[in-house]
Amino acid sequence: FLFARTMIGVFKNIEYMCSRTNSKTWGKEAWKKIVVCVVSDGRAKINQRTKAVLAGLGVYQDGIAKQQVNGKDVTAHIYEYTTQIGMELKGTQVHLKPRSGVPVQMIFCLKEKNQKKINSHRWFFQAFGRVLDPNICVLLDAGTKPGRDSIYHLWRAFDLHPMCGGACGEIKTMLSHGKKLINPLVAA
């Protein structure tokens, strides 16, 4: 559920960038400039529902990963796919559906061992950063749902200020309508 919520937000951001037809950088083919990298910390630890969502998107195949190849320990398993499958949430259920229009390029790195979040960040920058050579990177934890244009605005901060080394967005609690009034700290 948390992973799907994050991915839905990321997919909507990619759609938004593709809708910016008057942009010199973005527009109809913007999806070709964006790669969604998912790094999961430990094959034994990955959430089964997350694995199912990744398999449904086409970027993961269960049963292929091995602990060793030719007697040597495997560090990570890397899957790559350009998906045209979308998702929607109905309660806590994830429903996959065909996407109309915007494909999403995905890389999924399933680390063999659980080595914590900082190691996953290092994997992302050292393994994929060198190959992809991105202009910017946006790191999101599973469960964080970006607004439909928030990744664009982060990119824009870097584009307008090329000497900028980092930027962060705002995180709001996701509460159902009227729940904010129950807790006076949240309501304030």
UniProtKB/Swiss-Prot annotation:
Give the UniProt keywords, A-Z. Cell membrane, Cell wall biogenesis/degradation, Glycosyltransferase, Membrane, Transferase, Transmembrane
The protein's topology relative to the membrane is: Multi-pass membrane protein
Q: Which reaction does it catalyse?
A: [(1->4)-N-acetyl-beta-D-glucosaminyl](n) + UDP-N-acetyl-alpha-D-glucosamine = [(1->4)-N-acetyl-beta-D-glucosaminyl](n+1) + UDP + H(+)
Q: Name one Pfam family in it.
A: Chitin_synth_1
For the keyword Metal-binding, the answer is no
Top-level taxonomic group? Eukaryota
Predominant localisation class: membrane
GO cellular component labels: cell septum; plasma membrane
Coiled-coil residue spans: none
- Compartments (UniProt record): Cell membrane
Enzyme Commission number(s) from the entry: 2.4.1.16
Q: Does the keyword Lyase apply?
A: no
Query: Looking at its record, which EC class is this enzyme?
Result: transferase
InterPro entries (alphabetical): Chitin_synth, Chitin_synth_fun
Alphabetized GO MF terms: chitin synthase activity
Task: Provide one Gene Ontology biological process annotation.
Answer: chitin biosynthetic process
**Which family, according to the similarity comment?**
Belongs to the chitin synthase family. Class I subfamily.
Primary role: Polymerizes chitin, a structural polymer of the cell wall and septum, by transferring the sugar moiety of UDP-GlcNAc to the non-reducing end of the growing chitin polymer.
This protein is called what?
Answer: Chitin synthase 1
- The gene name on file is CHS1
